[in-house]
Structure formats: structure tokens, C-alpha cells
Amino acid sequence: MGELNIRVTGMTCASCVASVESIVSNLEGIDSVRVNLPLEKATIRWSEGANEDLGVVRDAISKGGFGSEKYVDPKKYRKESLENANRMGLQVIISLILTIPTFFLTMFVGDLGQIYDLDSRLLIAFILSSIVYFYAGIEFHKGAWQAILSGRANMDVLVHIGTTTAMIWSSFVVFSPYLDFLPSVFSSTAHVFFDGAAFIISFILLGNWLEARAKLRATDAVFSLMDLKAKTGSIVNADGSVSEVPVEEILRGTEILVKVGQTVPLDGIIVKGSASIDMSMMTGESNPVFVTENDSVMGGTIVLDSAIHIKSTKYHDDTVLANVINLVDEAQMGKAPIQKLVDRISAVFVPVVVACAVLASLTWMFFSEGHGDYNSTELAIMVLVSTLVIACPCALGLATPTALIVGTGVGAQYGLLIKGIDALQNSYNTNTLVLDKTGTLTVGAPSITNIKSINSDENNILEIAASLESASTHPIAKAISQAHLENSEKLISFDRIENIGGMGLVGYLEDQEYAIGNQPLMERKGVLVSNYIEELADVLSISTVVFVSKGKKLLGWIEMKDKLRETTNLAISKAKELGLEVIMLTGDRAETALTISKEVGILRFEAEVKPDGKAEFVKKLQSEGAIVAMIGDGINDAAALAVADVGIAMGAGSDIALEAADIVLLRDDLLDVVSTLELGKATMGKIRGNLAWAFVYNLIGIPLAMGVLISSTGWLLPPAFAAGAMALSSVCVVFNSLTLRSWKPFRA
């Protein structure tokens, strides 16, 4: 199933988005299509075995009145958008300079005499407004005709019909002395709407300009991430010389020199030197991080104080930074479930508005005697124009994507990678937070506090334990292996090692069975440990104990303790403030779990949970009605992360974490978990607020423009006010989304 991104130009509102999606989805072999209005981007997915012909897609889009090209250079498109915004800004200035005198001429200026039997005041207003109509409004008119000729309707159609109607009526009034065939309603004493037409174009153009600038600001975050990418790297040749080459040409395993002040070009491992690294742009971590030999570094970070040599571990398109950008890009193409309703409404929005405008206009023309100084025909024209221009499909089209772009972008700047709209939606609804103890509440690096020998010496116990644990990546295994290496590098070469999930490891050597693990494993193997449990009672309440056996004989045990993360207590407190129930999962005994839960303020825990039991526990919570966010390391907790409503992998840049989790956090900080859920709630709050505003605006604005208050209050919405309201509605949506830029994560 192939996927392709294309750029679509010429879209102005939600109706355009609906049109493009309809055009492409109706093509043979298309499985799905998603269109993002602010990004001018469409993601197309073909069905299995379909002919993936980009030319057919582009032809169909072109016939629909839009432009398209393969999406390859977002920085170039951003530059073009900036240039378009600048051109639009010039049009706004010229338009307003001409519109303001037009307004005064039609509303306040008295008789200025005549020129060739024409009212000079109205003639000047005609000339000024015509310049605005043809110069500043050209894109609206072109867009409208492209839409009409392709059999669709959009915002441009509404603006074009409204302004053209006002200009034609007013022009007939100005030139009525030369147009004897016109009915008396077009006499030179009739009202003109040059100011309305000019204000409509000026206000909507001003709104579009503000909107364009705001959309550029909304994408700042993801483009700042793109700017982190190094273009070249200094590779170390076999003879020790250094060559500068494009990062695209650097292979895995290549030694790279990174000097002070330079950006690390690719992910890698330090093979020589040590330095302080600025990771602020990748993770939001303000303090420099010290790294030395064998430590991993991420591409996009900056070396601050000393040159280092790294060995690259990833290609340029597979680094953590590249994955971050791809994740953000994918997330920004998502649609909230409510957006499907918006899309259905948008598909019929413009035709319905035109029908309402015509119906209201005809009603006032034939069933009223006018209003104030306006006769029934003039009133009908005002109602028609006002209804057409106040309707705003733009606000509907921008409500979701602008908030999504800003929310996911600002999250990425702080190392909070939200993979899609579903993760945001579920984080908004989350009411239960499930935390794995090891590596989440604790640092995940336990240290040995004591080795107790029963039927062997300590060194022998440690050697057997390290030899068995050599087959495991569990934090306990790493601690035992590291402790053994400090005394000896000798390991027992077992014939076979078996991993017993949630219990421990069993090794076989010359028909002899060795085991390391918890009490249930020992009991399963017939090793008597119950006699020592009372002796270990105090230890078990604060430490993890692993037993070591040979056959049915207990050799001894190893006591280990893992430190709590510095921010654990604060994070739990913040989670409770958000109204979340916090639950701890651990494979430890209940005594240890109880001690830790009391220490961090967690009221509910589940102890002695096997790895496969984590997913079952999450399912159990969901069956009780909980919306569950599961936090783990993305490796040992993959099943639970996948089952949870929101799976959060903490401190992980691994491929497994990126696959398993809905949200990936680059920092090892539990506060980021709470920050991400808070960001999800804030972003979804903006989306819902935007959609509510867009719907309420149209539901109130359109009836007002149709004149529902004329009979009861005598109040009529002038076309210029309608245009201002329309422009303001979409601008409000974008600027409301932009307030997310000020969001900050929790920090200790």
C-alpha cells in the first residue's frame, strides 16, 4: 500500500478541502486521502496492488480548479507562502487607502457637482472601488470562476457574487442618466454600495493576510526542528585526515569529528573525547548534558566546549531528529473525529448559503416595503450581499488543523512527540494513569546493596547470576553484570538459557540446572526459600531480592535497590491535580510495592505483575470504564502500550518505542508525562473551542444578515460589517490556536 504527499494550491476554505478529498477519493485505486488546509498538503494512500499514478491524481485535481505538485521541499513552500503574504499585505494597504475615501464619498460627502451629467461624487467612488474590485479582489474572482467552471463552490464564490452584485447595482445607479432602458429603481438618487463592495474585499483580504501570517507562525516549531539538521559532517578518513561531506553520503559506522559549536550531524556513539551537549532544541532540556566515551548522542544537538569523535549509528533519514520531524508531520495531517462532521457540512455549506441569501433577498424584495431610506429592491440587495459575505467556511476549515499544528509543534520543541490526533483526543479524555515502576517511577538503574550466601561464596553467586543474566536486557541484569565485571570478566558458558516471563532465568549446564529469579520461580523449581522470607521481611519492603539456586539448593540471594526519579513525587502530585487516578504496576512483591507507593503518594498499585499481565491489567481497567494512559519504556511494555488508550514511551528514542507508543518522550522525566497529557487537553480544548466558535458564528451571523431582526428591532447588518465579521471569524480561530505557542511544560 503506497503513500504519497502532494502540495495542493488554490484552497481557501473547508469547502475546498472537501472538494479535493472528494475528487481524489473518487479515483480508482485510492484507499484514503487527507488534506490539510494550512499546510496546503494532501496525503494519498493507494489500495493494495493499485496503479500508483501521480499524473492521474494531478490531472483530476487540476480539473477541479486547483494546482498540485509532489510535496518535496516544505522550506521552499514556506518561502513562497511568505512571499504571497507580503504581496497580500501590499494589496491590503492599497485597498484600504482606496476604500476609506470611497466610504466617506458614499456616506458623508455632499454634492460635488456633475461631470457629463453624472454625479461626480458617485463617479469618483465608482473609480476608486473599481480599482479595489479588480486589483485587490482579483484572486477572489479568479478563484470563484475556477470553482464555478469545475462545478464546485467555495468562499471565493460567496465573495465574488456578493461584491459583483453590489458593484453592478451601484454602477447602474451611477450611469443611469445614459441608460434609459433601466427601470426607475436605478435612478441617480438610489443608494449605492461601492463602499460595501470595497470594504468586503478590503476586510476579507486583511483577514486573509492576518491568517496567512498566523499560519506561518503556527508552523514555526516544525521548521525550527528542520533547521537543526546539519547539512554536512566532518568524516575521519583512514589516514587520519578529515573531509567535509554531505550528511546524505555518511554511512553507518563512519567516524565523525564534531568540533566546538558544531551540530552533531547524525546519531552516534562517542568513541573519543567528552563534552557538554546542548539538547535544548531537541528535548527542551535547558541545562547542558555531559557526555563521554560510549555515551550516545543525537543528531541536531550542539557540542559546547570540547571536540568529540563519534561513530554514526543511523543514516540521515533514520535519526531521532528525522523520526521526530516525520512524527510531527504525520500528526499534523490528522483529523479529529468531529472534523468528519465538519467535512460533511463544508461540502454543502456554500450552496446552502447561496440558496439562503437568494431566498431572503427575494422575500424582502417582494414581501416588504423596504426599510428606512432603502426601498425593497435596495434592501434585497443589502440582504443578499451581507448573507453571502458573512458566511465563513474558512473558520470551519482552520479550526482543527491550526490547533493541531501548533500543539504538536510546541510539544516537539520540548521533546514531547505526539503521533496523531487520536492520541490527543484520548489524552484529553484520560482519567487513569498507569505507571510501570522500574524505569518510570525509578531511574531504572538498580544497584546491588548486599549479596547473601547460603551454600556458596559471594563471588560464585555473582558469577552464576551474571552468566545467567547475560541473556537479558532487564535493568536488574545490567546491574548484576556491571557488578560482576568490577571483579572478574569470567562467565559460565551455559548450554542453554531459558527466560521464564515475570519470574527470572534458568540455565542448563551438563545436566545441572541453575536459576535466578523471584520466590515463585524458586518454588516452581522446588527450591525452599520460605524459611528465609521472615528474615528478609524488612529488606523486601524497600528492596528487590533475586534468589540464585543450583538444582534444588538455594545458593543465596542478591539485594538490590533502585532510586526514585527526582521528579517522581512532583509528577504524581501534578497528575492528581489534573484529576487523574494514578496506579503503579510492578513485578515486585506487595511489600516493596506498598513501601514505594506510600513514598510517592500513590494510593493504588498492582504487585507481582508479569510482563504479559500488564496488558491484561490495562484491559481490565478499560472494561471498568477507565480511559487509560500507560507509561513504560517502550520495549518491555510494548503490549501494554499498544492496548492502552494512550501509550506513552518515556525517555526513548528507540525504534520499538516509536512503533509501540502513541506518544514518545525524549527526556527521562516523569513530569513530561503529565505535561504531555496537559498539552493534549489544552490542544483539544482549542480545537473544540475553535469549532464551537465557527459553528456559533455562522449559526448567528447568517440569520442576522438575512434580516431576522429587521421587523422586530429595525436593525439591519450592513455588507461592510458582514465582511468585517467574516474576516474576524477566521482570524480569531487562528489566533486562538496560536495562544498554544505560549504553553510551557512542567519543570522541577
What do these predicted regions represent?
Residues A198-V260, V291, I418, T592, ...:
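Juxtamembrane coupling segments of multi-pass membrane pumps/enzymes
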Residues R87-T232, R344, P351, I451, ...:
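Transmembrane helix-loop-helix hairpins at the membrane interface
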Residues Y77-I97, L123, G143-A166, I325-V358, ...:
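Soluble-to-membrane junctions at the N-terminal ends of transmembrane alpha-helices
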Residues M1-G2, A18, L509-D511, T544, ...:
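Conserved ATP-binding TGD loop and adjacent catalytic N/P-domain core of P-type ATPases
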Residues E28-S47, G55-D59, H191-V192, F223-D318, ...:
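Conserved cytosolic catalytic loops of P-type ATPases
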Residues M1-L122, F134, S241-V242, A322, ...:
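Flexible metal-binding regulatory segments at protein termini and peripheral loops
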Residues L112-D117, L149, I168, V410, ...:
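Membrane-embedded alpha-helical bundles of multi-pass transporters
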